Amino acid sequence: MMATQTLSIDSYQDGQQMQVVTELKTEQDPNCSEPDAEGVSPPPVESQTPMDVDKQAIYRHPLFPLLALLFEKCEQSTQGSEGTTSASFDVDIENFVRKQEKEGKPFFCEDPETDNLMVKAIQVLRIHLLELEKVNELCKDFCSRYIACLKTKMNSETLLSGEPGSPYSPVQSQQIQSAITGTISPQGIVVPASALQQGNVAMATVAGGTVYQPVTVVTPQGQVVTQTLSPGTIRIQNSQLQLQLNQDLSILHQDDGSSKNKRGVLPKHATNVMRSWLFQHIGHPYPTEDEKKQIAAQTNLTLLQVNNWFINARRRILQPMLDSSCSETPKTKKKTAQNRPVQRFWPDSIASGVAQPPPSELTMSEGAVVTITTPVNMNVDSLQSLSSDGATLAVQQVMMAGQSEDESVDSTEEDAGALAPAHISGLVLENSDSLQ
């Protein structure tokens, strides 16, 4: 790559920009200023074409040095890795304006068309320079990411291959073992076996594995408890090491998958807080966002966990309660429908035309008073002639009437503290052929 060269406005002076202008009008040579003796005149000067006139107008324009500088910056941005920035061009513009003002030179010429052409050309190159700067930044970002990825991959390969610098290399093993030897535990002190034996066991690296120094565990009293490694060399193959590492990674992945599959159990404190809120607002068990945030702060849960718990609670706790209450409602209505006045067992003409004597009362074991009203043609003696089956049936009807009244009071007066005792007005028996 080409080295980045420093460009400035000073490198584009009037003298240098005139070098690119082709002078079509050649001056006469001093040696050939006089015609020869034969009177042959010099060849006539060729006339300038319109293109040549336009070129001269561009080269002689006051903004041409700035245009050339910008063009050079764009070329350098495409050739080298270190591209020029737009900020440096802004500085060059300031320097150019300051220099033109200092020297008293104009910024434009007498031709407005040429001035417009130069300004537009500078604007186009300026936009091109900005785009090149963006591309350069993207390239640098890509290179940095790619290099970081390569470094990570190379470090992982070095870790598995056991090359120098990896944790499984002999150098790293010596450092780890030296750190272990200085560790004191309640069971004993771990020291190299070479420190206890006359012959030292040297460490060596063989092809395909690493040889480790044997280690012996010694109690604080100086007694040898056990020798954790054999005095011989221990060789760990790289393939076995890589296989073991792969197995460990697979176990870790399985543990992660099993932990994800397990359903999370919320703390008991959190469920108690949410359950209490649910029953306090059982009429409208839908917490607002602020209430959810407050509950999440109290229970150390996330908003998602709180929201899911309330959704499940409305379906699993409140819905069964609502279903059970709906199933008991028909029974209540059925019992209420049974609460009707005692049906008369004789014609209305007899009941309205005959005066009734004072009733006779019988006391039951439950404390209910049963009043038996006898018509004119019946007396107490005729009541004694009732069969036992008829009397039992009459008492059962009285008890059922009392129960129906109690249940009707429960269904219609839910806010009452206690139920009023049922008063049974009387039991009217029909003087029919079946009871005689």
Swiss-Prot record:
Ubiquitous. Isoform 2 is expressed in all examined tissues except in bone marrow. Residues 1-49, 401-436 are annotated as: Disordered. It is found in: Nucleus. SUPFAM superfamilies: Homeodomain-like. The keyword Transcription applies. One of its GO terms (molecular function) is sequence-specific double-stranded DNA binding. The modification Phosphoserine is found at residues 33, 41. InterPro entries: HD, Homeodomain-like_sf, KN_HD, PKNOX/Meis_N, TALE_homeobox. Residues 80-163 form the MEIS N-terminal domain. One of its GO terms (biological process) is erythrocyte differentiation. Residues 404-416 have a biased composition (Acidic residues). Keywords: Activator, DNA-binding, Homeobox, Nucleus, Phosphoprotein, Transcription, Transcription regulation. Belongs to the TALE/MEIS homeobox family. This is Homeobox protein PKNOX1.
